[in-house]
């Protein structure tokens, strides 16, 4: 996708992409078809293929590889991505532990493969994952169940990034049932997760018999009623993608509403996101991954708004990405990971201020 950038921003984009190519070429040589998650002291030591094949982030490394193959045509990226995808078949066999994040796992691996190469085996894998996701649908509550906990009425805003798998299955099979499930879920998230000011709940708990909202736990943010920044980012990008596939105006309006809230918050911290926009001012906890994901959503929004609106969203995205580059990126090709200072949640220490694989994907 081409964006109408001024000369300064275009120069920055071009130079940054050259750095990305250099860095990821070296990483691909080192990592190959292992499945990285968090880099420790500049090294992706854990291989999720060996330790947790059903982990929700396992699709991001092959997603990076497919992006690089698509951009450069270098075969090594394709070879490594295919290797990871083969390993992910074990997750289908395990089954227990898979949940709503099958979209994250197979959209960026198998579906990306099929879109780029036409690989029929990858198509089958993507459709298998789509059926698993659709099978989590609660027809009385009109939502897709999140996670595998003892409360089957839980829904998290992250799920918005997984429903594009269902739209892809709709198009691939010509079967509208996948869209019906997706849109019911997106409507439920829109009506119960997004607040009037554009901030979002991370978790909503719904009555499984009728979809009535029961409670809003704090989740990975500071607490109930707070504003977990990556959750806001999932909403921005997720609603924009649902608009892309359905053209339902309410989805674009919702994406814009959350985007305006997000932009107003990161403007207070020079373009980078804290973990939660409604947490105490001290201590300061950052989450770089929220910013880069939100930037993707802002660019997606810019593709669907009138010409006079486009510049606002593009410039906001570029500001976030430039700030991330300046404050949080490591371009040493001998050091695994680019985007530093990612955080999984507000209260956990082991995944606070660390490089997390999805930061580099977005």
Tell where the protein language model's regions lie, with residue ranges.
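Glycan-recognition and catalytic cores of secretory/periplasmic carbohydrate-active enzymes
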Residues: 1-362
């Amino acid at each position: 996708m081409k964006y109408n950038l001024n000369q300064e921003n275009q120069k920055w984009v071009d130079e940054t992409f050259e750095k990305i190519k250099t860095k990821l070429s070296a990483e691909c040589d080192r990592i190959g078809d292992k499945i990285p998650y968090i880099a420790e002291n500049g090294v992706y030591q854990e291989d999720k293929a060996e330790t947790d094949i059903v982990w929700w982030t396992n699709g991001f490394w092959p997603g990076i590889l497919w992006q690089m193959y698509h951009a450069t045509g270098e075969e090594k990226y394709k070879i490594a991505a295919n290797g990871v995808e083969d390993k992910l078949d074990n997750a289908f066999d395990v089954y227990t532990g898979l949940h709503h994040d099958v979209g994250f796992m197979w959209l960026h691996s198998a579906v990306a493969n099929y879109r780029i190469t036409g690989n029929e085996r990858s198509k089958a894998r993507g459709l298998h994952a789509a059926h698993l996701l659709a099978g989590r649908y609660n027809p009385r509550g009109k939502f897709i169940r999140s996670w595998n906990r003892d409360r089957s009425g839980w829904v998290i805003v992250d799920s918005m990034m997984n429903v594009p798998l269902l739209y892809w299955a709709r198009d691939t099979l010509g079967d509208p049932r996948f869209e019906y499930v997706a849109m019911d879920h997106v409507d439920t998230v829109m009506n119960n997760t997004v607040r009037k000011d554009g901030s979002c709940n991370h978790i909503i708990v719904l009555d499984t018999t009728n979809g009535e909202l029961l409670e809003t736990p704090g989740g990975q943010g500071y607490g109930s009623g707070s504003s977990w920044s990556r959750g806001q980012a999932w909403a921005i990008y997720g609603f924009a993608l649902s608009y892309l596939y359905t053209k339902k105006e309410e989805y674009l309006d919702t994406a814009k509403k959350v985007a305006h809230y997000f932009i107003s918050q990161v403007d207070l911290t020079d373009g980078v996101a804290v973990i939660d926009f409604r947490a105490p001012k001290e201590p300061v906890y950052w989450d770089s991954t929220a910013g880069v994901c939100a930037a993707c959503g802002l660019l997606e929004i810019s593709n669907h708004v009138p010409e006079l609106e486009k510049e606002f969203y593009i410039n906001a995205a570029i500001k976030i990405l430039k700030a991330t580059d300046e404050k949080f990126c490591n371009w040493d090709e001998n050091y695994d990971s680019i985007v530093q200072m990612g955080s999984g949640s507000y209260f956990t220490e082991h995944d606070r201020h660390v490089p997390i694989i999805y930061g580099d994907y977005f």
